[in-house]
């Protein structure tokens, strides 16, 4: 793949989708699929991991996999972003994103017209973490505005098109 950032901008979406994420050190024309769960961790990688270095080298498929990393690089290149992160499920993506912005004492304004697993997590887990979950009819803009003004809100969250009702929020 092209290593110069300016050259990457010249590539079409199709070329980017096919070739991003592959490592020139592997000399592979296709993105490899790694079907292993454990990777060798050398002394340098171990030290990086122990020091909390983000994106430290691979050691377990539970935390990192070269196949996933290739997909992340492809998505980032296609979106013109610095980086990307993939998850094994929608709930993992939703919870990670929300918990990145919310902590004990924070507030989220949302709607009950969400995927059932999201509502369950908000009602059981987020409240247990001390996060104030406030539900409104997301289509009632006056109710949304009132909820946002009555107390400091850290996140306004809705899904569109909703699952499973396919409503536009």
Where do the language-model regions lie?
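PLP-dependent aminotransferase-class I/II
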Residues: 120-169
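Buried hydrophobic positions in well-ordered alpha/beta secondary-structure cores of metabolic enzymes
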Residues: 27, 75, 93, 108, ...
């Amino acid at each position: 793949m092209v290593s110069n950032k300016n050259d990457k901008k010249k590539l079409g979406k199709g070329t980017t989708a096919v070739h991003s994420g592959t490592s020139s050190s592997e000399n592979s024309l296709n993105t490899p699929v790694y079907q292993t769960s454990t990777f060798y961790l050398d002394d340098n990688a171990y030290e990086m991991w122990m020091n909390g270095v983000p994106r430290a080298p691979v050691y377990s498929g539970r935390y990192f996999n070269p196949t996933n990393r290739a997909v992340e690089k492809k998505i980032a290149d296609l979106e013109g972003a610095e980086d990307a992160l993939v998850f094994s499920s929608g709930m993992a993506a939703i919870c990670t994103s929300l918990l990145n912005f919310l902590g004990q004492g924070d507030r989220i304004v949302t709607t009950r017209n969400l995927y059932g697993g999201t509502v369950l997590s908000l009602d059981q887990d987020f409240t247990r973490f001390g996060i104030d979950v406030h539900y409104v009819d997301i289509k009632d803009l006056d109710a949304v505005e009132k909820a946002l003004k009555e107390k400091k809100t850290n996140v306004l969250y809705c899904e569109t098109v909703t699952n499973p009702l396919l409503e536009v929020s």
